[in-house]
From Swiss-Prot:
Family: Belongs to the protein kinase superfamily. CK1 Ser/Thr protein kinase family. Casein kinase I subfamily.
Function: Casein kinases are operationally defined by their preferential utilization of acidic proteins such as caseins as substrates. It can phosphorylate a large number of proteins.
Protein name: Casein kinase 1-like protein 7
UniProt-listed Pfam families: Pkinase
Active-site feature positions: D128
GO cellular component: cytoplasm; stigma papilla
Binding site for ATP: I15, G16, S17, G18, S19, F20, G21, E22, L23, K38
Name of the gene this protein is made from: CKL7
Residue spans of biased composition, Low complexity class: 382-422
Start and end residues of each Protein kinase domain: 9-278
GO molecular function: ATP binding; protein serine kinase activity; protein serine/threonine kinase activity
Region (Disordered): 299-324, 340-464
Phylogenetic lineage: Eukaryota, Viridiplantae, Streptophyta, Embryophyta, Tracheophyta
Length: 476
């Protein structure tokens, strides 16, 4: 396809595709910069690229949000041009033989929670949290996680009044069945709690290599979703998190205890994992499992192995010098990936060499970066042409509650609901001022004695700029 987009972006080879379009490599003919170009036929039955581009514009400036460079129509296609990114976490998970160490998962968890929290502060849910939708950056941003694919995103509150969307049931399953929350399976309208529960499943997937409801056989897609739902509901949190630190049990109990319109305490969840990270003696040096596999000398230099703790004289934790040792070894090596076959292509294009002088930037959770995507056959994503409607026999049990939310502002809706239990019992908290699980309700059920303190949300400084998008046509 010989096409120049917007007068300056030349279309290259196809690098990915999904249920909502195709992804191409592109290049800015004026600067030589490589970009990602997402195409969607204007005649598609359920167009969403224009909607997705609006969400990208709303989220611009956030850490781990790709820059949108151009959107418009070229011939028969709606086109969005954004930053080119590296491999997805699914690609890297496969590269690491489908299991990640606790250290790598905890380093990722901190960034992933930040990405989800940022979307929520902008008034939107993602609704398709999965490893394929988190990509690593390129070059100096190679250690930064980016969140992509906002086509299923939904506004959950009015940007001016902060009024929360109403509680509803009998909703179709939106997202990817493997990582969908229990209440999403049961047809309950999604809210912030559901993105966080999905993120918890992603973390357990990384740690354990698979989830209990993977590989279930069924005759139709609906029957498969039914089986996944039944298995997910019947698996106690303690069984799901067996042989993993208790912080993951606490994470799930917290997420499932949130009411529909509750504002999650993101700081509490991040603190759970940060305290565990420090207690394990790890260094936040951005030496991920895939870094060690690609550059074994980094692992030995940093005093870590891919499956053990860091033993170092430096004080463990998040304040340690991030990638100084990695800089010395990598020198000016530009970490460059392509999708699909991201890591393999990277290995072919960049043989391990350590002769260059140090010039690697310290990549913390800073600003922007690039883009790319791969769709995996086992993702079980429910697209708009085949939605799953929860059967009435497993409908969520709803009950109105007038208990004021301790986290939401006065303008947030007080309508809430009881969730359907999907856990076999409580866990235990992990100390350090964090609430124990005994203070929490049984997983999935609401409690009038719920007493978590909520962090007061900072006033959105960009509200005025965002109001121009208030007329944005949003998903039902």
């Amino acid at each position: 396809m010989d096409l120049v987009i917007g007068g300056k972006f030349k279309l290259g080879k196809k690098i990915g595709s999904g249920s909502f379009g195709e992804l191409y490599l592109g290049v800015n003919v004026q600067t030589g910069e490589e970009v990602a170009v997402k195409l969607e036929n204007v005649k598609t039955k359920h167009p969403q690229l224009h909607y997705e581009s609006k969400l990208y514009m709303l989220l611009q400036g956030g850490s781990g949000i790709p820059n949108i460079k151009w959107f418009g129509v070229e011939g028969d296609y709606s086109v969005m041009v954004i930053d080119l990114l590296g491999p997805s976490l699914e690609d890297l998970f496969n590269y690491c033989n489908r299991k990640l160490t606790l250290k790598t998962v905890l380093m990722l968890a901190d960034q992933l929670l930040n990405r989800v929290e940022f979307m929520h502060t902008r008034g939107f849910l993602h609704r398709d949290i999965k490893p394929d939708n988190f990509l690593m950056g390129l070059g100096r941003k190679a250690n930064q996680v980016y969140i992509i694919d906002f086509g299923l995103g939904k506004k959950y509150r009015d940007l001016q009044t902060h009024k929360h969307i109403p509680y509803r049931e009998n909703k179709n399953l939106t997202g990817t069945a493997r990582y969908a929350s229990v209440n999403t399976h049961l047809g309950v309208e999604q809210s912030r709690r559901d993105d966080l529960e999905s993120l918890g499943y992603v973390l357990m997937y990384f740690l354990k290599g698979s989830l209990p409801w993977q590989g279930l056989k069924a005759g139709t897609k609906k029957q498969k979703y039914d089986r996944i739902s039944e298995k997910k509901v019947s698996t106690p949190i303690e069984v799901l998190c067996k042989n993993q630190p208790s912080e993951f049990v606490s994470y799930f109990h917290y997420c499932r205890s949130l009411r529909f319109d509750d504002k999650p305490d993101y700081s509490y969840l991040k603190r759970l994992f940060r305290d565990l990270f420090i207690r394990e003696g790890y260094q936040f040096d951005y030496v991920f499992d895939w870094t060690v596999l690609k550059y074994p000398q980094i692992g030995s230099s940093s005093g870590s192995s891919s499956r053990t703790r860091h033993h170092t004289t430096a004080k463990p934790g998040f304040n340690a010098d991030p990638i100084e040792r990695q800089e010395r070894i990598l020198g000016k090596e530009t970490t460059r990936y392509k999708i699909p076959g991201a890591v393999e292509a990277f290995s072919r294009r960049h043989p391990t060499t350590t002769s260059s002088p140090r010039d690697r930037s310290r990549s913390r959770n800073s600003d922007d970066g690039p883009f790319s995507k791969q769709t995996h056959g086992d993702s079980e994503r429910a697209n708009s042409s085949s939605r799953y409607r929860a059967s009435s026999s497993r409908k969520a049990v709803a009950a109105s509650s007038s208990r004021p939310s301790s986290a939401g502002g006065p303008s947030e809706s007080r309508t809430s609901s009881r969730l359907v239990s999907s856990s076999g019992g409580g866990g235990s908290g992990s100390g350090n001022g964090r609430p124990s699980t005994s203070q929490r309700v049984q997983a999935g059920y609401e409690s009038k004695t719920l007493s978590f303190s909520r962090a007061t949300a900072a006033r959105n400084t960009r509200e005025d700029q965002l109001r121009s998008f208030e007329l944005l046509s949003l998903r039902k």
